[in-house]
Structures are given as C-alpha cells and as structure tokens.
C-alpha cells in the first residue's frame, strides 16, 4: 500500500495541510486470503475513498466561500476607508465653503446700503446743503467758543482770589489794632491762630459792638484823599474845575445839604470803660 500527501499552495496559511490515504491492492494476488475477505476489504477501501473525495469536494467548495468572505471583508475595509475619506473630504469641503462664504458673499442690509448711497450727490444731485444749516453750525461753534472762554476766565478769577483775604481783619475791644485769623493744620486738626494784620490805607474800619459787625470811616481817610489829590497833574485839575463849573451852572436849583455823621461805640461788658461818642467832620453831598 502507498500514501499520497498533498498541500494546497494557493490557500491561506490558516488552512491545515490535507492528506489523502489510499490503499491500493498489490499486483500479486494473495491466494491465502479468502475471496470474501478480499471483497470486503475492497468495498471498505472504495467507500473510504468516496468519503475522502466528498470531504475534499466540500472543503474545495468551502474554500472559495472563505476566500470570497476574506476578499469581501478586505473589500468592505477598503470601501469603508474610501467612504471615510470621501466623507472627510466632503466635510472639509463643506466646512471650507461655509467658512469662505461670509468673506466672499456678504449680504448688505438696507441701512448699510442707505449709508453707502446717502452722500452720492455727484450722480443724483440730491446732496444739497442749506445755507441756514451752515450759519447755524457757525453760530453753534461761536457759542461753544464763548462758553469755553467764560469758563476759563471764571477759573482764572477763582485762582486769583487768595483764601487768606477771608475773613477780613477785625478790631478788638481793647484797641484799634486789627487781628486776622490764619488757619493751619497740625496733627490732622485745623488750628486757627490770631495774627496782627498789617496796616492798610483803607477808608473803612470793621469793629464789633452789641453783637453786630459795624463798618466805620477812618479818621485818616481825609488825609489819604488829600494826598492823592495833590499828585494829580495841573492839566487834569484845570479840566476838573471846568467840569465842576458846568455842573454848578446846571444845578442852580438844587439844594445842598450838610449832614453830621456820628457813630456811637460802646463796650458790651460793663467792667470795661465805655467809649465816648466820636464826632466826625461834616461833609457835603450833592444830589442830582
């Protein structure tokens, strides 16, 4: 007997090698065996050969199916990859189109179009300006300039007024010496100190009496006025005399009154000496 072994080269490595076993009768018959046993063995061999053939046919039929399934799986994978690439390319195209659309195609609203075509007077001739509007604009600009200058002058005046002049210097109960209050800060507190004010050539003097503030004319005011009159040039004095003569001629019917001015000044406290009445010199007042 002999055995034949063969292996399919075109199949995949997963398939195991297949072997066929055939039993062949020897050319020299053995007459020692009975004829019935020989027939039985021949029948068994033939049946076994048929079974093996059927198995081979089934496996051969199954192999293309397996090959086709393998090819189909590979094709499905390739088709899936191709479809995925197609979907990605299509999505990229859509996204790029969606992104580029606003930059390339922008829809203008009615307001924007109106703004664009509002001042195209060279084409339609509708851009006409009124003279009244131009003058009104000029007036507005002038008013703004005046207001700005006024505000600047007010600020400069506020800066020029020194806060040290307020409150004005006042006289004391003991004498005519003027005292002025000076504020200053010390350790986070406001401290008011009384300082002697420098003498001023003023016509009025401030003093307190009976809980009130009174202004009185200084004694040296007439001398101060006389000194100022002496400094006037002679030409100005002549013109001044001529004007006085003309006024006297016109005011002949007017009456000249003489008034005596007396100011009473007393101390509030009784322990101190009372101040006497001050007799002021009389002066003339002309009324027209």
Curated annotation (Swiss-Prot):
Q: Where is the composition biased (Low complexity)?
A: 66-90
Effects seen without this gene: No visible phenotype; due to the redundancy with other FAF genes.
Biased region (Acidic residues) positions are 223-256
User: Which InterPro entries does the record match to this protein?
Assistant: FAF, FAF_dom
Biased composition range(s): Basic and acidic residues: 48-60
Q: What segment(s) does the record annotate as region Disordered?
A: 48-100, 146-172, 222-261
Where is it made, tissue-wise? Answer: Expressed in the shoot apex, stamens, young leaves and young siliques, but not in old leaves. Detected in provascular and vascular tissue, but not in the vegetative meristem. In inflorescences, restricted to the vasculature and absent from young flowers, except from anthers.
* Domain FAF positions: 165-217
The role this protein plays is:
Able to repress WUS when constitutively overexpressed, but have no effect on CLV3.
> What family does the entry list?
Belongs to the fantastic four family.
What's the protein name?
Protein FANTASTIC FOUR 3
Q: Which organism is it from?
A: Arabidopsis thaliana
Q: Gene encoding this polypeptide?
A: FAF3
